[in-house]
A protein has these predicted regions:
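Conserved hydrophobic/aromatic "anchor" residues
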Residues: 11, 126, 133, 173, ...
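CheY-like receiver
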Residues: 73-77, 115, 206, 234, ...
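Short beta-loop-alpha junction of Rossmann-like oxidoreductase domains
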Residues: 135-137, 192-194, 198
Length: 327
């Protein structure tokens, strides 16, 4: 099978490309190497890892998903599945430049869809986000996990809004043009190669160095942290199963919710040092909890996460140490 992966040099994209090639697929990776959220050198490092893949099974093309001509050159008619991971991520940065997020995430996805429509391609796997659920007042996170059929009417950030708009955009293309879509709602992914702006990366580095970490709020906000290997298993299963004319949404999470304070304590145990904590008020755009019900993904994709946070953080720390990246 020939798979196009957009955002191929990113955190999730690079791992997905490696897994697909290992499974025997041919992969064309596309990435803009944008330095907006973090230095482009980080993606260059990921690309160096991808360069070790067999040249007859993997190629990496530099292209912006918003550039129609570039995407026309990058995506050919022999493609079986498009795995669209490219996007501007991050809740807080989206508050500063919402128009930039709209252009990349909405227009860029539209360019990908139009290229697929022009070629008659009909199988797409899309990276959505748990942020589409927004704030759910009155829901006890420890009891009620997020289900795919829960209302998603109040995204708390421009980033979240773009991801929900993407889901509607993709549904429309299924209805009008028969493009099959599996939209995967990722829940706080972490692990080797994670973005440097992510909380776990920042906390691990600061605690290891003995420098202060900043906690927004009282530490009670909760996240469903999901290790990269589990996420990629779900992505590859979706690529194998997506079919023309189908539109499905699946949660991909770790199935347990951990408070920010608990996360800090896990990192302290793994790194072997105590955190120096500076507290700040809650930030706009943050939601109090995310928590995935993955029953639908388990039934349809065979998705079964196997990495609890303590083990995942330990594996991430081991990777930092083994690759000389540990502070």
């Amino acid at each position: 099978m020939h798979v196009v992966v957009t955002g191929a040099a990113g955190f999730i994209g690079s791992h997905t490309c490696e897994r697909l090639v290992a499974a025997g697929h041919r992969v064309t990776g596309i990435d803009a190497f944008d330095g907006y959220l973090y230095p482009a050198e980080v993606k260059r490092g990921n690309a160096a890892e991808l360069a070790r893949l067999p040249a007859d099974r993997f190629q990496l093309i530099t292209a912006d998903i918003c550039d129609r001509e570039a995407m026309a050159r990058a995506i050919g008619g022999d493609v079986d599945v498009v795995c669209h991971l490219a996007a501007l991520a991050g809740v807080r940065p989206s508050l500063e430049e919402p128009l930039r997020y709209l252009r990349t995430n909405i227009e860029g996805t539209g360019v990908v869809l139009e290229r697929m429509r022009a070629l008659g391609l009909a199988r797409l796997v899309f990276a959505s986000s748990s942020s589409v659920y927004g704030v759910r007042p009155g829901v006890e996170a420890e009891v009620v996990a997020f289900r795919e059929d829960d209302p998603c009417l109040a995204p708390a950030s421009p980033y979240a809004a773009t991801k929900r708009m993407n889901e509607l955009q993709l549904s429309t293309y299924r209805d009008l043009f028969g493009i099959g879509v599996f939209a995967l709602r990722f829940f706080t992914v972490y692990g080797p190669r994670q973005r440097p702006d992510m909380a776990i990366n920042k906390f691990v580095a600061a605690i290891a160095r003995g420098t202060p970490i900043t906690l927004f709020g009282d530490g009670s906000s909760r996240r469903d942290y999901t290790f990269i290997d589990d996420i990629v298993s779900g992505v590859v299963a979706a690529i194998d199963r997506v079919a023309p004319g189908r539109y499905e949404i699946y949660n991909l999470g770790g199935t347990q919710t951990v408070s920010l304070q608990e996360l800090v304590e896990i990192i302290e145990r793994v790194v072997g040092k105590r955190a120096v904590i500076e507290r700040r008020p809650l930030q706009p755009g943050d939601v109090p909890v995310t928590y995935a019900n993955v029953d639908r993904a388990r039934a349809a994709l065979g998705y079964t996460p196997t990495t609890p946070p303590e083990l995942g953080v330990a594996r991430y720390w081991a990777w930092l140490c083994d690759t000389g990246r540990a502070p």
